[in-house]
From Swiss-Prot:
The keyword DNA-binding applies. Resolvase catalyzes the resolution (a site-specific recombination) of the cointegrated replicon to yield the final transposition products. The active site is at R145, K170, H234, R237, H260, Y269 (o-(3'-phospho-dna)-tyrosine intermediate). InterPro entries: CB, DNA_brk_join_enz, Integrase-like_cat_sf, Integrase_catalytic, Integrase_recombinase_N, Integrase_SAM-like_N, Tyrosine_recombinase_XerCD. It comes from Bacillus thuringiensis. This is TnP I resolvase. It holds the Pfam family Phage_int_SAM_1. Keywords: DNA integration, DNA recombination, DNA-binding, Plasmid, Transposable element. Residues 107-282 form the Tyr recombinase domain. PANTHER family: PHAGE INTEGRASE-RELATED (PTHR30349), TYROSINE RECOMBINASE XERC (PTHR30349:SF81). GO terms for biological process: DNA integration; DNA recombination. Residues 1-84 form the Core-binding (CB) domain. GO terms for molecular function: DNA binding.
């Protein structure tokens, strides 16, 4: 087993989310590719000088933004911890000061409006795929993350009470989200279709495919792209937060539904987005 796969197994043993495992493992594979391409040798441990050179490469050659670089540094820090536990390394060579300081952006991350979402949902509806419509409606009107939606099991939701348990929330936290009539109707329609899937009897998951017992997020991203170049699963989450606040939800109500551990994250949705800020600048 190569070291990246070993690292992936290590993360899973720590009960990291599927998203975190994929993101960190991808970051390490990229570093290994850069290291072996630069020095023509196999990676056995991390060296401080190499880390500094890699960060410089990400900044000046790849021209990545601070957020992307910081994510790769976080991956390397976790990988460093893994190598120490494995006995391949003794020292921690990634420091907290390696992280690039970023000024907090106070603009709302929402880039789409209600009309955009309605048009998108109508396109999915007219395509007559009940599963895809149920997923899109769930994301737009509950604010759950795509990873959370795809981890919902058949015994996690109650169509009578309109409640769903999110067991795989960020940081391993559980919460109950409320399902409105639009979501309930879409799920009920899909459940009839779900019975025709060959994997329906074996799979405990709500969202399945014809071949797999659990729908993959890359498949969902591809489905969304076939309908829109702008609307993504994550944009629907942003839309929910902004839409809920505009419809009268309190900050704490939105935070509970969306699973925000920090209330300041929710507060961002009370602010204008980048385009609105630019338009305001033109008024000066």
């Amino acid at each position: 087993m190569d070291v990246a796969k070993q690292f992936s197994s290590y993360l899973k043993q720590e009960n990291k989310t599927e998203n975190t495992v994929q993101g960190y493992t991808s970051g390490i594979r990229q570093y290994i590719k850069w290291f072996e391409g630069s020095y023509d040798r196999k990676l056995t441990k991390l060296y401080r000088q190499n880390i500094l050179e890699y960060i410089s490469y990400l900044k000046n050659v790849k021209m990545l933004n601070a957020k992307s670089i910081n994510h790769k540094i976080s991956s390397l820090a976790k990988f460093n911890e893994f190598l120490i536990q494995k006995g391949s390394q003794q020292d921690q060579v990634i420091l907290k000061t390696d992280m690039i300081k970023v000024q907090t952006v106070y603009a709302s991350p929402t880039q789409i409006v209600e009309l955009d979402v309605k048009k998108f949902l109508q396109s999915v509806l007219e395509d007559n795929n009940k599963r895809n419509y149920a997923i899109a409606t769930l994301l737009a009107y509950t604010g759950v993350r795509i990873s959370e939606a795809l981890s919902i099991k058949m015994n996690d939701f109650n169509l009578q009470t309109g409640e769903c348990i999110i067991r795989s929330g960020k940081g391993g936290k559980q919460r109950i989200v409320l399902l409105n009539s639009k979501v309930l109707s879409a799920i009920k329609d899909y459940l009839i279709d779900r019975k025709t899937y060959s994997t329906a009897h074996e799979s405990p998951y709500l969202f399945i495919s014809k071949k797999r017992e659990k729908l993959d997020r890359t498949v969902v991203n591809r489905i969304f792209k076939s309908y829109s170049n702008v609307i993504t699963p994550h944009q629907l989450r942003h839309f929910f937060c902004t839409n809920a606040i505009e419809k009268g939800f309190s900050i704490h109500e939105v935070a509970n539904q969306a699973g925000h551990s920090n209330i300041h994250t929710t507060l961002l949705y009370t602010n204008p987005n980048q385009l609105q800020l630019k338009n305001k600048m033109e008024l000066l």
